[in-house]
């Protein structure tokens, strides 16, 4: 009698646990499928061999939505660093290290943003392709030249020159690596020229 009661009690507990687990899983699945990025869950490539990656942990699995969000944060941070550095330029002689720190942080955040959205190895490959290698070299060379002119040479004129060149390289970098950047610029140029031709007599 006692053994029969225990077996019935165990079966009831087991059925209750299975029901709770099923309801929890169904609730979690409904919540996950309701998210806008539920069908876009991908893993950032971290190795040239494709499927085999250096990092197998879940921290390197990001959805497309999450990658775009991090890209936007890095790009806004980069623009903010450049803007603050430009405003600090009048006090460059007094605080050159802060200027260089902001300038370098802005450059690194821009590169990091594109590396996140494209994948680190994929972005490095794009940086070293023949058609984009001049932009890559000009971007990092002008960055290094700005730092040297500010810290080592301590020349305001050279800092301005290399800083302007680096800003131009940064714009070229955005156009080259931003999704549909070249097409957007060409379309904007055509629209601007068409509007200008309509305004001119």
From Swiss-Prot:
Protein's membrane topology: Multi-pass membrane protein
Q: Which GO terms describe its cellular component?
A: cytosol; fungal-type vacuole membrane; Golgi apparatus; Golgi membrane
Principal localization? Golgi
Q: Which residues lie on this side of the membrane: Cytoplasmic?
A: 1-68, 120-132, 181-201
**What keywords are assigned to this protein?**
Golgi apparatus, Membrane, Protein transport, Transmembrane, Transmembrane helix, Transport
Statement: the UniProt record of this protein carries the keyword Hydrolase? no
Note the superkingdom of the native organism: Eukaryota
Please give the residue ranges for the topological domain Lumenal. 90-98, 154-159
The GO annotation for biological process reads: Golgi to endosome transport; intracellular protein transport
Report the InterPro entries cross-referenced here: Vesicle_transpt_Got1/SFT2, Vesicle_transpt_SFT2
Protein task = Nonessential protein required for the fusion of transport vesicles derived from the endocytic pathway with the Golgi complex. Can be replaced by got1.
UniProt family annotation:
Belongs to the SFT2 family.
Kindly provide the name given to this protein in its UniProt entry: Protein transport protein sft2
């Amino acid at each position: 009698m006692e053994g029969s009661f225990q077996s019935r009690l165990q079966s009831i507990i087991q059925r209750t646990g299975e029901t709770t687990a099923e309801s929890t899983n169904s609730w979690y699945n409904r919540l996950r499928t309701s998210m806008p990025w539920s069908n876009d869950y991908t893993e950032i490539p971290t190795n040239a061999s494709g499927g085999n990656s250096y990092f197998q942990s879940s921290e390197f699995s990001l959805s497309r939505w999450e990658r775009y969000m991090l890209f936007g944060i890095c790009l806004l941070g980069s623009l903010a660093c450049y803007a603050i550095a430009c405003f600090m330029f009048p006090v460059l002689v007094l605080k050159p290290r802060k200027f260089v720190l902001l300038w370098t942080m802005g450059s690194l955040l821009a590169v990091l943003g594109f590396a996140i959205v494209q994948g680190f190895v994929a972005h490095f490959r794009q940086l070293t392709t023949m058609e984009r290698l001049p932009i890559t070299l000009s971007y990092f060379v002008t960055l290094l030249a700005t730092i040297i002119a500010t810290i080592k040479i301590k020349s305001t004129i050279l800092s301005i020159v290399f800083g302007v060149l680096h800003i131009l390289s940064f714009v070229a970098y955005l156009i080259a690596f931003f999704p549909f950047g070249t097409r957007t610029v060409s379309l904007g140029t055509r629209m601007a020229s068409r509007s200008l031709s309509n305004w001119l007599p």
